A protein has these predicted regions:
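Extreme N-terminal basic, low-complexity initiation segments
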Residues: 2-8
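Condensing-enzyme catalytic core mediating Claisen C-C bond formation in acyl metabolism
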Residues: 11-61, 167, 171, 191, ...
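Conserved active-site "lid/cap" helical segment
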Residues: 17-122, 188-198, 202, 221-227, ...
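Short acidic, glycine/serine/threonine-rich loops at helix termini
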Residues: 56-58, 97-98, 154-160, 215-218, ...
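Beta-strand segments within the central parallel beta-sheet cores of soluble alpha/beta enzyme folds
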Residues: 79-88, 113-119, 143-148, 200-208, ...
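Active-site-proximal alpha-helical scaffold in enzymes
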Residues: 119-149, 178-216, 256-262, 364-387
Length: 422
């Protein structure tokens, strides 16, 4: 049954014991509800991803269709079987109106609910989360999430679009993403006593590794191999970040279709890939206050990762997670030890936990609404043993991490997928 009746009985029991309620009592009831609720499995029925890059020959509709057609073919469903959709896009210049209409009209969806979402760089993952929750609730049986961005035509280059209003802080137009993240790298080095040379070599190793992985991926934007010298001798963007430490501006789209295991099996699917956790944490302003945050880490990532591991039942992420997008705030590397793990090859394609095996944000660029789903697409291929030349053994769990905004105020998303039953 999809009716969570045990929770009702548990709440009734607690209410008879508590004559007066305070915040701690309500938390007790909330926790009891969560522990009593049955967990409904959600699986990836199909996924699709467009070619990423400078897609001057294609508009956003073309990119959406490219990803959608691959996803529906992979899932083995027709558009009339999709009961609800979530549309992730962040740059308003490419669409008329803030609604789900562009997705519904482009894909000719059959008058179903389409929800447009935007949540910084976690926009695609937010769309995916909405689709998963819809199926988990029992509201629909098959749901779609699609993210798209056409950045090259808008002229967007990573700077905040803060000039449109008159109530914004005046410093915002001068704050760039490379500048703010460079400050975090500097704070990290100072806190952990990291030599600048080691920091630069670790970042160069990541860039070289990402380009090598992308050379095997026909859908990546940048597929050229580079050397450590190329990275270290490249122009500086914001100390210590150089040209090859920053991702490109790209166009792209990615799509996921989710359902229940029972429906997936009825459609002939085997070796199902389940959605283990979807967690998002959003800054509340505490990082900007004079507290314990020192600018060397992402508080939201630590919180989202902790929740995701708990939801997925992962107790030892360093040994249980098979693939990921790396960040030591994910608790894979111990605090301050991430650089050593990178230089030791821990995150290489042949390492213990391969990272950015598709080329990552570095080589796909960052079409904002599409990136989260594009990351999941690689996990989906890897877990299904369909990544071709990039295949990394026989993974069990895959983790993706989106972070949008700035170190002091951001949205952090951690999603875990894995073999059903693992």
């Amino acid at each position: 049954s999809r009716v969570p009746h045990p929770a009702i009985n548990r709440v009734a029991e607690l209410m008879t014991r508590l004559p007066e309620f305070d915040s701690s009592d309500w938390r007790l009831i909330r926790d009891a509800c969560r522990s009593s609720l049955p967990r409904f499995d959600i699986v990836l029925l199909g996924m699709g991803c467009s070619q990423f890059g400078e897609r001057w020959e294609a508009n956003d509709e073309d990119l959406m269709v490219e990803a959608f057609e691959e996803a529906t073919k992979d899932a083995g469903v027709e558009r009339h079987q999709i009961e609800a959709a979530w549309f992730g896009t962040a740059i308003e210049d490419q669409h008329v109106g803030k609604s789900g209409v562009p997705l519904a009209m482009t894909l000719r969806l059959p008058y179903i609910p389409v929800t447009r979402v935007e949540n910084y760089c976690a926009t695609g993952t937010e769309a995916f989360r909405g689709a998963c929750y819809a199926v988990a609730s029992g509201a629909v049986d098959i749901a779609l999430a699609l993210g798209v961005e056409k950045l090259k035509d808008t002229g967007y280059g990573g700077l905040p679009q803060r000039g449109r209003g008159n109530l914004n802080n005046l410093y915002w137009p001068n704050l760039s993403a490379p500048g703010s993240f460079a400050q975090l790298a500097t704070a990290y080095s100072a806190k952990h006593g990291v030599d600048r040379g080691d920091l630069k070599r670790a970042m160069a190793h990541i860039s070289v590794k990402s380009h090598d992985n992308a050379s095997k991926n026909p859908k990546a934007h940048l597929r050229n191999r580079i050397t450590e010298d190329d990275v270290l001798n490249a122009p500086m963007v914001a100390e210590p970040l150089g040209l090859y430490d920053c991702c490109g501006v790209s166009d792209g789209s990615a799509c996921a279709i989710v359902t229940t295991p029972e429906i997936a099996r009825s459609l002939g699917k085997t070796d199902l890939i389940g959605v283990k956790a979807c967690q998002i944490a959003v800054s509340n302003g505490q990082e900007l206050q004079y507290d314990e945050w020192d600018g060397s880490y992402f508080a939201t990532t630590r919180i989202a990762a902790k929740r995701a591991y708990q939801e997925a039942g992962i107790k030892d992420p360093r040994n249980q997670v098979s693939l990921l997008v790396v960040h030591e705030d994910l608790n894979i590397s111990a605090e301050g030890k991430g650089i050593g793990d990178v230089l030791d090859g821990f995150y290489d394609s042949a390492g213990s936990v391969p990272c950015q095996i598709d080329g990552g944000l570095k080589c796909f660029g960052h079409p904002i609404g599409a990136s989260g789903l594009r990351m999941l697409y690689e996990m989906y291929l890897q877990l299904g043993g369909r990544a071709g030349e990039r295949q990394t053994g026989d993974p069990v769990f895959g983790l993706t991490h989106n972070l949008g905004g700035f170190p002091s105020q951001n949205v952090s998303s951690v999603t875990i997928v894995g073999r059903l039953g693992a």
